[in-house]
């Protein structure tokens, strides 16, 4: 059920994403020296706009929550691919940044798999 998912699946994802965000923020600041890119108000506003595309998990079944989370992470994986390509084309993709983004993308694809498995309905 949801409580087990919350601790075991979503808890793991939340924790890892927080660590990932901190590492990316440090890298962005180190490479650009532009603190305004890391403004919490700006980041939260952008995240809210993106989340408006997806249904609220309120009153959803545990399966539907997993399926919605799966859609969110798949969309993010596609965005990541485009972001990586744009950085490369702009000659802003350092070896270290490429390594960090690739490791993050690998984790996100793992989340997609785990969420897909959780979203399977019992037959």
Describe these PLM feature segments.
Residues 18, 34, 89, 116-117:
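Residue-identity detector for glutamine
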């Amino acid at each position: 059920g949801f409580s087990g998912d919350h601790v075991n699946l979503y808890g793991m994802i939340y924790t890892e994403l927080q660590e990932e965000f901190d590492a990316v923020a440090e890298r962005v600041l180190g490479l650009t020296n532009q603190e305004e890119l890391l403004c919490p108000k700006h980041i939260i506003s952008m995240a809210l706009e993106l989340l408006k595309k997806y249904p609220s998990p309120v009153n959803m079944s545990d399966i539907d929550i997993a399926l919605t989370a799966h859609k969110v992470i798949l969309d993010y994986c596609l965005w990541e691919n485009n972001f990586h390509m744009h950085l490369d084309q702009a000659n802003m993709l350092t070896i270290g940044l490429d390594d960090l983004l690739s490791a993050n993308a690998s984790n996100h694809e793992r989340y997609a798999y785990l969420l897909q498995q959780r979203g399977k309905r019992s037959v």
